[in-house]
A protein has these predicted regions:
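Rossmann-fold NAD(P)-binding glycine/threonine-rich loop
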Residues: 40-64
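Structural motif
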Residues: 12-13, 36
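Beta-loop-alpha module in the N-terminal Rossmann-like domain of NAD(P)-dependent dehydrogenases
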Residues: 13-30, 43-47
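Conserved Rossmann-fold cofactor-binding substructure of NAD(P)-dependent oxidoreductases
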Residues: 1-11
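C-terminal catalytic/substrate-binding lobe primarily of soluble NAD(P)-dependent oxidoreductases
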Residues: 82-301
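Short, acidic/turn-prone active-site loops that include or flank metal/cofactor-
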Residues: 1, 20, 41-46, 66-68
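Adenosine-phosphate binding glycine-rich loop
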Residues: 57-96
Length: 301
């Protein structure tokens, strides 16, 4: 952290892309260093608690600016600016093209954390908490039958969008993966004292190799004022660059928002998750255009 304090002030903008376990501390250090930030660390802490610090130091931090959370929040923020939104659902997953397996496009420890942290969602205006991996449902996506289950993905939406009576985020995996993870969790492999060992074992099994093809799929459904809006994102490993779809969809969303800060299109200090940024239609349209220019399939169905 001392090294960050020493070098961060030399830059106009810093992208914080560290493991979630240290993300909050690093973001706090960057704000104390008075530098603008785009954060894609997805730390478990409530990042909105740093808003006063960001304002005090006159810096802007766009947080959770990946694909989900991130792009889905931007889409919701856009519609919430002119619709009386009644429900929001996000189904999202990054998977290998080889069926019925799993490869982690980011830290296995962060994936495991998704499977152990209680999942919070909003139902009829109340926060409901269930076990992660609960409420499985089959979902057809791009001709594939996948399985969705609860994960704690709403994050900042629980605070910023309290007026929306129904909100849910679910993770997508191949059928069968959920049952394997429940077995490991219930057998104690995901307990804190065993996590380092489990992560090492799963890292070898889940490691995305250079020539592994994978894809990212997201479906966002928003209902309100007797309207229904469904957006779908689909991207695959880039055959030429070998960049994974998760890298592309997360990284390019982050880059689009970096452009907003560096071109002085925002100019307000504070902590801003995607739903607060997406309320401005010009930002929403900029992000959608930025992704489409990079051949990421993103359409309103």
């Amino acid at each position: 952290l001392e090294t960050i304090k020493n070098i961060a002030p030399n830059f106009d903008l810093v992208v914080c892309a560290v493991p979630g376990s240290v993300g909050f501390k690093v973001l706090k250090t960057l704000l104390e260093s008075k530098v603008d930030v785009i954060d894609i660390s997805f730390s478990p802490e409530n990042i909105l608690e740093l808003n006063d610090l960001a304002i005090k130091n006159g810096v802007t931090a766009f947080v959770d600016m990946g694909v989900a959370p991130g792009l889905d929040n931007i889409i919701l923020g856009y519609y919430d600016s002119f619709l009386n939104v009644e429900s929001f659902e996000c189904l999202v997953g990054g998977l290998p093209k080889e069926k019925y397996t799993y490869k982690a496009p980011f830290s296995p420890a962060d994936v495991i954390e998704e499977y152990t942290r209680p999942a919070r969602f909003i139902e009829k205006g109340k926060i409901i908490t269930k076990e992660a991996l609960s409420d499985p449902q089959h979902v057809v996506a791009k001709g594939l039958v996948l399985q969705s289950f609860n994960t704690d993905g709403l994050r900042s939406l629980l605070e910023t969008m309290k007026h929306i009576p129904n909100m849910k985020e679910k993770t997508l995996r191949y059928v069968g993966h959920r049952e394997e993870m429940i077995f490991l969790r219930d057998s104690g492999f995901f307990n804190k004292e065993n996590l380092e060992f489990t992560s090492k074992v799963l890292f070898d099994k889940w490691k995305l190799l250079p020539f592994d093809d994978e894809f990212t799929f997201m479906r966002v459904t928003i209902k309100g004022d007797n309207e229904k809006h469904v957006w779908e994102l689909y991207d695959e490993t880039d055959k030429k660059t070998r960049l994974s779809s998760m890298s592309r969809t997360t990284g390019y969303t982050c880059c689009a928002m970096a452009e907003v800060i560096l071109s002085n299109q925002w100019g307000r200090p504070g902590i801003f998750p995607g739903e607060l940024v997406g309320r401005e239609s010009r930002i929403f349209k900029h992000v959608i255009s930025f992704l489409k220019e990079r051949n990421i399939e993103l359409v309103e169905c």
